[in-house]
Regions:
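Helix-loop-helix hairpin linking two adjacent transmembrane segments in secondary transporters
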Residues: 133-181
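Conserved MFS/SLC helix-loop-helix module at the cytosolic interface between two early adjacent transmembrane helices
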Residues: 55-90
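Helix-to-loop junctions at the C-terminal end of transmembrane segments
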Residues: 56-68, 253-266
Length: 393
């Protein structure tokens, strides 16, 4: 199968994991009424995903490094299977929860494959673009979930919504199951150990993990609490559109920024700009909160914040090599999902005061800015697995 067709199928599957993750998030009120559970329980249908990721990230990454075809195939089957399982009882909380657990178990196997797919099927000059495309697919899935949930629910209830999403997941899974039968065009070094011991003393990877902790944490906190924060200023009704604007900006940023910074070897500069913008944006929003201004500010934030993920993943693959790419991404996304849980809880603790809530987001960005100074200015500064700072072909 052509490498771009493989990437397209993988992107569809990766987007499907986000689509299924956030199925119930935009329609929490309707879900709790239809299923006869509390709004908190309805919210748990999405909340289990980051917790499952924290538990499964490292073993999933190690399995991908050792048996890529089997591991990614399992992720595809679990994603499609979970989507179908929810159709057993569209209005049943029990079936919904069971399906979400199955999808959540498959998600790390899919998302940890982003750099592995790029390394196996793409030549070195195209890998940054392939990693960017894989990352963009995640944001497209998030946006699709946010924008389609309400209309599909109103058009045909939960059954129509779940059927459409299951169909997307099944097609994507079938595509990937065919794609993984294609032999790797670029093999790794079989002598490299897939043990996780190397992570313990790899300071570079810990710094990248800290930055993803901040970045994904900020995004999750904004997505969770923006409505409540702006509600204190009388503008809560605009939160859904503002989050969509932030996500669209991120799709644009992730599509163009990683290749540009990789070509100029300016990865650290981009990450420093990202956390710097985070500090400024939320500090300024606390003082200026007209909807138009907030939209512009969040567009700028989304453009750099969501573009930072493929930059970090690309840098990690360059640093570790393709043999350990699954474990590396698993470790980084574990940190990111943990950040999502922690920062959501931190903001929740001060949610009664919008200034403290926005200040917490700015402080998180400031911590990331300090952390970013520990990165080398350029890849050739000695962090890369290849001494030249260039990818092995």
């Amino acid at each position: 199968m052509n490498r771009w067709a493989i990437l397209a199928g993988f992107g569809m599957l990766a987007g499907s994991t986000q689509l299924l993750w956030l199925t119930y998030a935009p329609i929490t009120t309707q879900v709790h009424q239809a299923m006869g559970v509390s709004e908190g329980a309805a919210g748990d249908l999405a909340g289990i995903f980051p917790l499952m990721y924290v538990v499964l990230a490292l073993p999933s990454g190690r399995w991908l490094d050792a048996r890529f075809e089997r591991a990614l195939s399992a992720g595809a089957i679990l994603t499609a299977g979970g989507g179908l399982l929810r159709l057993a009882g569209p209005s049943s909380f029990g079936w919904a929860l069971a399906g979400q657990f199955v999808v959540a178990a498959g998600q790390p196997l899919v998302l940890n494959s982003i750099t592995k797919v790029a390394a196996r099927y793409f030549p070195a000059p195209q890998r940054t673009a392939a990693i960017s495309a894989g990352s963009v697919s995640l944001y497209v899935g998030i946006l699709a979930a946010v924008l389609s949930g309400g209309p599909l629910l109103h058009a045909g209830g939960l059954r129509l919504l779940l059927t459409v999403q299951a169909a997307v997941a099944v097609v994507a899974a079938a595509w990937v199951l065919l794609a993984v039968r294609t032999p790797a065009a670029f093999g790794g070094d079989p002598s490299v150990s897939v043990s996780l011991r190397w992570l313990r003393h790899d300071r570079f990877m810990w710094v990248l993990a800290g930055l993803l902790f901040v970045g994904m944490g900020v995004f999750n906190a904004v997505a969770t609490w923006l409505d409540t924060i702006l509600g204190h200023f009388g503008r809560g009704g605009a939160a859904g559109y503002l989050i969509a604007i932030m996500t669209v900006a991120g799709i644009l940023g992730a599509a163009v920024v990683p290749q540009a910074v990789a070509a100029r070897d300016r990865r650290r500069a981009l990450l420093q700009v990202t956390v710097g913008v985070t500090v400024v944006v939320f500090a300024v929003i606390s003082g200026l909160h007209p909807v138009g201004f907030v939209a512009v500010a969040l567009f700028a934030e989304g453009f750099v914040l969501l573009a930072a993920l493929p930059v970090v993943l690309d840098w990690s693959e360059l640093h570790t090599g393709p043999e350990r790419a699954g474990s590396a991404v698993g470790f980084l996304l574990l940190a990111g999902n943990l950040g999502g849980v922690v920062l959501v809880l931190v903001v929740q603790g001060v949610i009664g005061n919008p200034y403290l809530s926005l200040g917490a987001l700015s402080l998180a960005g400031l911590a990331g800015l300090v952390l970013s100074t520990r990165l080398p200015a350029h890849v050739a500064g000695g962090t890369s697995a290849a001494s030249t700072g260039q990818r092995r072909p």
